[in-house]
UniProtKB/Swiss-Prot annotation:
This is Chaperone protein DnaK. InterPro entries: ATPase_NBD (IPR043129), Chaperone_DnaK (IPR012725), Heat_shock_70_CS (IPR018181), HSP70_C_sf (IPR029048), HSP70_peptide-bd_sf (IPR029047), Hsp_70_fam (IPR013126). NCBIfam families: PRK00290.1, prok_dnaK. Belongs to the heat shock protein 70 family. The keyword Oxidoreductase does not apply. Residues 578-588 have a biased composition (Low complexity).
């Protein structure tokens, strides 16, 4: 069975891992780094992903970052005049991860386990699955990030019974989950979170502070300058990371903008204390879900055995202090917060292929599910934190006399009124025989699969007529749209491959021109003039083809020149060999010496 890779598709960074010899292992990217920025850029029709895209973000307006924040919405991003859905952008990142995983493994990769924030709703999960499909991946399982982290942490400790709190603060999302580990069973007791809170927001408070300081000093508002803002974003991210290790950092951005008197420079010193003050509100926002999860699990903080920190933003000292204060214990430092989620996804891949035995994962649904009933009330069928997969049915009736159809409005959320919750979908059950209100019996069944994706069925118990829907949110993609995007993604992958081959061909041709010139210099006076002229003509023809950028011609002229140069090089070696042999022969004749020898008997020594 082919390997199933584990992918942590993050807001700011992504990571891919695989199970090798029973151990999960992170696959490094082509630059040698273990995580890849979730950044896509377009430049003259060419796509760039990861490190390369992030490096030129300052100067390229067609750079897309943090697209995960828009998953499951109808938000579109525009680049070079074309609009893309968040699914397509995520698919480009997934394709990049898939590509270098294939190079590392030396075999095609078609299956993956992809992680999502525990608090992702159905639309966001469906969008993630669609992104995988567009990238040419069969998404075997969608699992929650904190659950994956617990899996990576607890795999070696299956004989211990533990209650673990996973605090996951990523680039754009925040989750907290409480799990019980024991006998190879990883059971999620409760989960809570905020999908609009992460490291990006910590960067933003620094950016806002720098903009305010600069305006106070120079009277110029940098927030109106797109290029200055990108430089500020990079500087803010770096300052945030620096302040995890030092108590003060200097932010220096020369020539940030120009005033009436000439260029202006930004020089600001930021202390850790000031950063703590700026981000205090954000840190406090993460505490409410921690309290909520403990309450839902029916636990007090003292009953926790371990607190595990996941996500790069958990390196912020104020975050660590707050979680320590809230739970009364030091967070466990034995896992790499950037990699642990991908490692857990790879382990889940191993569970699915049968390479990892005796591990059972019991996840939960993060939000309650139900339908709208009379008066706009949200009636829950499945409560949040219910272990999945699960199904639940309830019988409803009509609200008016002689009603022949009912609208089933499916929602997800915790608020009592339908209008305040997230619509997952709507469908209609028709042809109900006319009857007084309250008489028809309509059974509504909810079914949540192992990926947390919802199916809903409505059945008229009188006629046995049934209507079913797999929830595809209003922002979801149709099968035709997905197929079109899959095709486009494949074409782009081919185009990227072709572009790479073209660049390599040009480089080889340039290299050949250089080596030819060097070889001809070495051959001066050693071969016939006609042969040198022939080589020079072929070299000039290749140079002209490179100038014209005609790939077919470059290939033909390169092969032609290579043949001529090889023949000349063979001649050069032959001449060198003949000269060497002649030299050795002469040396042998000169060195002949008559000698006498005496045999020594060892016994006499």
């Amino acid at each position: 069975m082919s390997k199933i890779i584990g992918i942590d598709l993050g807001t700011t960074n992504s990571c891919v891992a695989v199970l090798e010899g029973g151990e999960p292992k992170v696959i490094p990217n082509p630059e040698g780094n273990r995580t890849t920025p979730s950044v896509v850029a377009f430049k003259n029709g060419e796509r760039q992903v990861g490190e390369v895209a992030k490096r030129q973000a300052i100067t390229n307006p067609n750079t897309i970052i943090s697209v995960k924040r828009h998953m499951g919405t109808d938000h579109k991003v525009e680049a070079e005049g074309k609009q893309y859905t968040p699914q397509e952008m995520s698919a480009i990142i997934l394709q990049h991860l898939k590509g270098y995983a294939e190079e590392y493994l030396g075999e095609p990769v078609t299956k993956a386990v992809i992680t999502v924030p525990a608090y992702f709703n159905d639309a966001e999960r469906q969008a993630t699955k669609d992104a995988g499909k567009i990238a040419g991946l069969e998404v075997e399982r969608i699992i929650n990030e904190p659950t994956a982290a617990a899996l990576a942490y607890g795999l070696e400790k299956t004989d211990e019974d533990q209650t673990v709190l996973v605090y996951d603060l990523g680039g754009g999302t925040f989750d907290v989950s409480i799990l019980e580990l024991g006998d190879g069973v990883f059971e999620v007791r409760a989960t809570a979170g905020d999908n609009r809170l992460g490291g990006d927001d910590f960067d933003q408070v620094i950016i806002d502070y720098l903009v305010a300081e600069f305006k106070k000093e120079n009277g110029v508002d940098l927030s109106k300058d797109k290029m200055a803002l990108q430089r500020l974003k990079d500087a803010a991210e770096k300052a945030k990371k620096d302040l995890s290790g030092v108590t003060s950092t200097q932010i220096s951005l020369p020539f940030i903008t120009a005033g009436e008197a000439g260029p202006l420079h930004l020089e600001v010193s930021l202390s850790r204390a000031k950063f703590d003050e700026l981000s205090a509100g954000l840190v406090e926002r993460t505490m409410a879900p921690v309290r909520q999860a403990l309450k839902d699990a029916g636990l007090s903080a003292s009953e926790l055995d371990k607190v595990i920190l996941v996500g790069g933003s958990t390196r912020i000292p104020a975050v660590q202090d707050a979680i320590k204060k809230e739970t009364g214990q030091d967070p466990h430092k034995g896992v790499n917060p950037d990699e642990v989620v991908a490692l857990g996804a790879a382990i889940q891949g191993g569970v699915l292929t049968g390479d990892v035995k005796d591990v059972v994962l019991l996840d939960v649904t993060p939000l309650s599910l139900g339908i709208e009933t009379m008066g706009g009330v949200f009636t829950k069928l499945i409560e949040r934190n219910t272990t999945i997969p699960t199904s639940k049915s309830q019988v409803f009736s009509t609200a008016a006399d002689s009603q022949t159809a009912v609208d089933i409005h499916v929602l997800q959320g915790e608020r009592p009124m339908s209008a305040d919750n997230k619509t997952l979908g709507r469908f209609q059950l028709t042809d109900i025989p006319p009857a007084p209100r309250g008489v028809p019996q309509i059974e509504v069944s909810f079914d949540i699969d192992k990926n947390g994706i919802v199916n809903v069925r409505a059945k008229d118990l009188g006629t046995n007529k049934e209507q079913a829907i797999t929830i595809k949110s209003s922002t979801g993609l149709s099968d035709d749209e997905i197929d079109r995007m899959v095709k486009e993604a494949e074409e782009n992958a081919d185009a990227d491959k072709q572009r790479k081959e073209e660049v390599e061909l040009r480089n080889e041709a340039d290299q050949l021109v250089f080596t030819t010139e060097k070889t001809l210099k070495d051959l001066e006076g050693k071969v016939e003039e006609a042969e040198v002229t022939k080589a020079n003509e072929a070299k000039d023809a290749l140079k002209a083809a490179i100038e014209k950028n005609d790939l077919e011609e470059i290939k033909a002229k390169k092969d032609e020149l290579q043949e001529i140069v090889q023949a000349l090089t063979v001649k050069l070696y032959e001449q060198a060999q003949q000269a060497q042999q002649a030299g050795e022969q002469g040396a042998q004749n000169d060195d002949v010496v008559d000698a006498e020898f005496e045999e020594v008997n060892d016994d006499k020594k």
